[in-house]
Amino acid sequence: MIIKPIGERVLLKHQKKQEVTKGGIYIPESARQEKKEGIVISVGTFEDGKELPLKKGDHVIYGGYQSDEIEIDDEKYIFVDFKDILATIAEE
């Protein structure tokens, strides 16, 4: 299935919450903070038709309160406005 966002939106695969600390301690669901990171699945375009400066596979941090969630094959995906993408994360 191919999903292409319309307008200045980005489809992200939500990064799962950490369930165990690096030291091996289990974090209960009630104490976990929602992680606002995701992997770019597909991107829309600017009004003039130019591509947004993100590509499939980019690891991003996003903010904002406006997002729409969908679930496909038990995986959580999120549509986020491009303006709410704060940064990309790259390995050094």
Curated annotation (Swiss-Prot):
This is Co-chaperonin GroES. CDD domains: cpn10. It holds the Pfam family Cpn10. One of its GO terms (cellular component) is cytoplasm. One of its GO terms (biological process) is chaperone cofactor-dependent protein refolding. Together with the chaperonin GroEL, plays an essential role in assisting protein folding. The GroEL-GroES system forms a nano-cage that allows encapsulation of the non-native substrate proteins and provides a physical environment optimized to promote and accelerate protein folding. GroES binds to the apical surface of the GroEL ring, thereby capping the opening of the GroEL channel. InterPro entries: Chaperonin_GroES, Chaperonin_GroES_sf, Chaprnonin_Cpn10_CS, GroES-like_sf. Transmembrane segments: none annotated. PANTHER family: 10 KDA HEAT SHOCK PROTEIN, 20 KDA CHAPERONIN, CHLOROPLASTIC. The keyword Cytoplasm applies. The keyword Cytoplasm applies. Gene3D superfamilies: GroES chaperonin (2.30.33.40). GO terms for molecular function: ATP binding; metal ion binding; protein folding chaperone; protein-folding chaperone binding; unfolded protein binding. Belongs to the GroES chaperonin family. It comes from the Archaea. Heptamer of 7 subunits arranged in a ring. Interacts with the chaperonin GroEL. It is found in: Cytoplasm.
